[in-house]
Amino acid sequence: MRPIRVDERPKENIFIFYDFETQQCTPVKGDPTTRVHEPNLCVAQRVCTKCCDNVSIDEPCEHCGDHEFIFRTNPVCQLVELAIQSMPNFSHVFLIAHNAGGFDAQFILRYLIEEKKTQLPSLIMNGTKIITMRVGKLVFLDSLNYFHMPLSALPKSFGLKTALAKGSFPHLFNRPENQNYIGPMPPAADYSPDTMRPGERERFFAWYNELKNASYVFNFSNELITYCKNDVTILRQACVVFRKMFKDSGRVCPFSENTTIASACFQIFRKNFLKPNTIGIIPTGGYRWAHNQSKKAVSWLVWMEHSLNRRIIHAGRSREFKLPQNLLVDGYYETPDSAHVLQFHGCYWHGCLSCFTVNRDRVQGDGDTLNERLERTNAISQRIRSSGYTLTEIWECAYDRMIKTDLEMSAFVSDHPLVRAEPLNPRDAFFGGRTENMVTLYDVKDGEQIRYVDVCSLYPYICKYGKYTIYVGDECRALTGPENNISLSRVEGLVKCTVLPPQNLYHPVLPVRMHQRLLFGLCRSCCETMNQDACPHEDPAERVFSGTWVVDELRKAIACGYKILTVSEIWQYNITQYNRDTQKGGLFTGYINTFLKIKQEASGWPEGYADDEAAQERYITAFKTAEGVQLERGAVAKNPGLRSVAKLCLNSFWGKFGQRENLPQTEIVSTREKLMELLNSPEHEITGMLPVNNQVLYVNYTKTSDAVIPSNIANTVTAAYTTAQARLKLYTYLEPLGKRALYCDTDSVIYVTRKEPGEYEPPTGQLLGDLTDELSSYGEGSYIKSFISGGPKFYSFIVNTPGGAESEVCKVKGITLNYANSSLINYESIRSFIIGERENPVVLQFDSIRRTPFHQVVTRPEKKSCMPLSVKRRRDGEYGSLPYGYK
């Protein structure tokens, strides 16, 4: 992975911030309950790199002209025309809306396809959601991909100095007959108050009734424009602050150089902190079958060994053999009379004439054509022969025919250990966070309290203090095979192995994927069947797990009673880790320290420190001692915007390393030639085609496995190390808490404390990686008196505050607990499930804004069922649980 050189040449760009308001009155043909959104207003604010930092846009800019535009008729068409007119004299025009991918940009995509006033756009999509859309110099972005928060949260998060606040508007009142309405306040129902959260709904009615009682005159046309202008102003000012902070702190423009917050943070790292030759690029086939050697090639080579009764040097055993002529060959062996070379030609990579008969002069993804590949293959073969070697060659398609017709060969190859054992796939070691409910209900008894603690900035803590692999990995063969007192003490990297867990560990260590979930179990067979009884399996073969894990998790597992039975493959790496004493080392230390410093300074002085220089000096010294970061006294001041950006950069950085290499892609096709090119392409695997009209198709595809090349930005081993160390950090609390732990989620634990002598109590603090009290906002000494959980990310509890008041908290993944939903899903309703008073699910009915496959935005009625589902552990007693396989 290479650092990015900073391009000092200034690029002049235009930024257009916009928002559509829509009517939703026209029903979809054949479905009167589904209504189509049709834009009837667009407000756009245009700035350029010369003037974008100005808060006010009242005066025109000498470079980009007028700033604000209001389009009432054909708003989509007029916005596109504005963007096209803005292109001359500028490198690019970036059009940005909040939730553009799910809403605003959908209208633009349909317009561009139907009207054909520009070339067809190129898309990066996630399902029907548009991540980015490009049309020549026009680039459409979604600000929600940079800061994932509602528009109403932006003024506070970015410290906007104007008195901006996102107001309420009666969207359901936006109908054709009301466009010229002037009169009393519209009905409250048109504001959809039941979709607001309870507190927000209460504030809305206070505001609404105040205006209604004051006989406020509601001018729909003016109110619509004011509301939309306010939204665009909030978006523009937040994006400008966001951009300036990225430019100042990382020399990166997030909008012109990236499409998401993760890619922007990653670019800051590569521009400012990545050292050359530090992070390796992982070969597509891993390190065991080096140089992209295929499973088929190894299968043929082991068959040739068997047929010839010769031991052949090949990648299945070590590495491909390098001839003195500096040529890597697939297989090599010697006889008394001759030196033999064996070559397996993959049809795609070597340009097979039989398999690929068309488009042979089309440039493929790696920059050459099929004809060029064949010419290169023939030239190498001729060079091998002319050097005196006996050459045996086979094409992949010929091998495929052999394996189908030669039963002896098929049986031998399929049962050969070098073929049967799949190479280590680093993505198999990349697991997510640990989320489990150990109980479904717990009410405190006398002398007990339930506490809720959270690790402060868990992933930034791991990125700074955790260990990371560096340079290029290598396969370690010395420790593979059946277990013979194998020691992993010298191993750093990934290990593919078979492990036998203990049978009495309340919190298992190693994660496994089953039933589309991340489980922590003690018996494979019990996990597979979700056995609700004590483990009946006596044969270790029924209990073992085979998988790939980061070696640190395996070391902890061994310490907790796991046994390694067989090691299949090891990827060995060099390691770097930050040393607190020397304040050196670590892969991401410089990046994390930079934004940790910004965040800490932008948080301002602790309470009571503002006018106490001695206290300030102690604070700066303590932070330097703890984190190795020197705060600047003059820079310590509350700055919500700067703090928000720093926090985003700390939390949004590492995930880019885990990005998949072969993401689905969408191409808009309007010619028969282009369609045939995709259908006949050796690089593309068509996954779907959708006719838009008589002239246009959406074609979805992925790259074929042969065409996938190693990513130059992803490193799954780095991502796996991050999440593994995060799980181990959580385990440092789960292990001593034992059965007192009621619930955990990635970086947090809910547990029972009895304050008995010698009882373990997780320590809290304020620094990176310390535990913090999640209940402190209710007042010091607050605790949970009753906790219930219907499964991971499905819980509710009652907080008892120091003043004796009680507060209810409820969280259910996938459900917005607005006023309407909160009346159906709450502490009491969840408890009624847990204690057996209710069996039927809660059914929620609501209107939802969706996108059709044709990128039409609609509102349609939907239903969602909700009921507890605790399946990650087996039940134990009335409300407890044990891991699958516990005995």
Task: Label every model-predicted segment.
Residues K11, F15-F17, T26, P32-H314, ...:
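Conserved acidic
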Residues M1-P3, E396-R401:
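Polybasic, low-complexity terminal segments and linkers that are predominantly intrinsically disordered
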Residues E320-P324, D400-R401:
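Acidic-and-aromatic substrate-binding clefts and catalytic sites of carbohydrate-active enzymes
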Residues V329-S354:
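Active-site beta-strand-loop-beta-strand hairpin of nuclease catalytic cores
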Residues H350-E372:
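A solvent-exposed, charged loop/short amphipathic helix patch at secondary-structure junctions
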Residues M1, H98, W349-H350:
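Histidine-centered active-site/metal-ligand motif
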